[in-house]
Amino acid sequence: MKSLFRPLIVVFVVLAAVTGLAYPAVMTVFGQAVFPSQANGSLIEKDGKVVGSALIGQQFDAPQYFWGRLSATSPMPYNAAGSGGSNLGPLNPSLKDQVKGRLDALKAAGTDLSQPVPVDLVTASASGLDPEISPAAADYQVARVARARKMPEADVRRLVADNTAGRQFGVLGEPRVNVLKLNLALDAAQTAQ
């Protein structure tokens, strides 16, 4: 009986060492050597202090900032521990209430609602943590942000264009604008004036 369990124990120990120690250690070293920023969470710094991550959205609700997608996490917006889809169907009254609330917030901030509102400004993403909006959603907010910052709209549009990332490898995904990076660029541009 002892001879039956010995190979099982040896295989278990070897596989545990390979999959639990060796593989994670090799991947950590590889990630730190080849992709250090991504391996450390794609952190964004301002004046030497970490202000966020390029991978997780942040709440911006002041009129002088671009607003991101709604967060599906509550009670704390953009809480990664509470990530998960909102799973609200198109006929769910809660979805209608969320969209109406966001439209009211856009209207209160002085946004012109006579034009169609990009869907990513009034709905949450699948994870509820999306840090990016579409160029159309950014363009929709240009007038409000420019007015609140007393900046020419052309300057704000240029910053949006400068912070628009294209499709990955030219074919994957859609063009997108990272809201945190754009808002930091706005702050920097206004400070430079």
From Swiss-Prot:
It comes from the Bacteria. Keywords: ATP-binding, Cell inner membrane, Cell membrane, Ion transport, Membrane, Nucleotide-binding, Potassium, Potassium transport, Transmembrane, Transmembrane helix, Transport. GO terms for molecular function: ATP binding; P-type potassium transmembrane transporter activity. The keyword Cell inner membrane applies. The keyword Transferase does not apply. Pfam families: KdpC. The chain crosses the membrane at residues 7-27. GO terms for cellular component: plasma membrane. This is Potassium-transporting ATPase KdpC subunit. It comes from Burkholderia thailandensis (strain ATCC 700388 / DSM 13276 / CCUG 48851 / CIP 106301 / E264). The lineage of its organism: Bacteria, Pseudomonadati, Pseudomonadota, Betaproteobacteria, Burkholderiales.
